[in-house]
Amino acid sequence: MILLCVISRTVLLNIRKRDIRFFTYFEFLLIAALHYGILILFLPVTALLLRTKEQSWYTIFQAVTEPVVLSAYKVTFLTAALAAVINAFLGLILAWILVRYRFPGKNFLDAAVDLPFALPTSVGGLTLMTVYSDKGWMGPICSWLGIKIAFSRLGVLIAMMFVSLPFIVRTIQPVLQSMEEETEEAAWCIGASPWTTFWNVLFPPMISPLLTGTALGFSRAIGEYGSIVLVASNIPMKDLVVSVLIFQRLEQYDYKGATAIASVVLLVSFAILLIINYIYLKRKSLTR
């Protein structure tokens, strides 16, 4: 509450210093929006960290360094990173196709990209199970090829790719749409090949949004629960991820352990987002 009061007073002073004629209702709406953002975003995070701080450092260290927990961290972060890298490549190609080409069903495909946003995660998991389980559409074919997707780490990877793909596509699409075709034509006129034009002219402006989308997709994959709990076997030391482990600890009434594990994930995700934002702002300042 003290933070809210300080921010509100600072905003009011800044507004009145700039223009005394600002309407009172504008000040009210601005302060209300700030309060809303703080209450929705910062208050739950602060509460989680403070609840973790109530425990001793030794208890926290014990909770987050159990072999099962370390294995869950490893599976979660490595699989989410792999999903983010694959989606960065495939999402870039998909965004390029949606922007640069016209074909039957393009609007349907463009709308389908947002499907993971609209679907409940449990429905997404059930959809993946319908396709990749042993009795699904692709399951028997994959089993015949010796590939097991459902109830394996590969299933976790596909679920993470499914929920995080829209972040890549939707962050790159506006950049591609804003690029003028005359720039490419000028590069071709001076003898540049299509591949050289892509790497030297088109790709540099896409680096920042690509990194941003990849980071958002990575963070989204880390927090995925609904689809993974259906696709994976959730066996410790095999394909158990952190989000499912936290829920299991809550079912066992181990609230302190669940809080400690969740705090580590929160801090790691926040640190990654800060690093990506720093890189984005650094590149933006250099291009000015």
From Swiss-Prot:
It is a multi-pass membrane protein. The keyword Plastid applies. PROSITE patterns: ABC_TM1 (PS50928). Residues 73-276 form the ABC transmembrane type-1 domain. Signal peptide: none annotated. Its main location: plastid. One of its GO terms (cellular component) is chloroplast membrane. Keywords: Chloroplast, Membrane, Plastid, Sulfate transport, Transmembrane, Transmembrane helix, Transport. The chain crosses the membrane at residues 28-48, 77-97, 111-131, 149-169, 198-218, 227-247, 261-281. The keyword Cell membrane does not apply. GO terms for molecular function: ABC-type sulfate transporter activity. InterPro entries: CysT_permease (IPR011865), MetI-like (IPR000515), MetI-like_sf (IPR035906), Sulph_transpt2 (IPR005667). It is found in: Plastid, Chloroplast membrane. Pfam families: BPD_transp_1. Part of the ABC transporter complex cysAWTP (TC 3.A.1.6.1) involved in sulfate/thiosulfate import. Probably responsible for the translocation of the substrate across the membrane. NCBIfam families: 3a0106s02 (TIGR00969), permease_CysT (TIGR02139). Belongs to the binding-protein-dependent transport system permease family. CysTW subfamily. This is Probable sulfate transport system permease protein cysT. It comes from Zygnema circumcarinatum (Green alga). The gene is cysT.
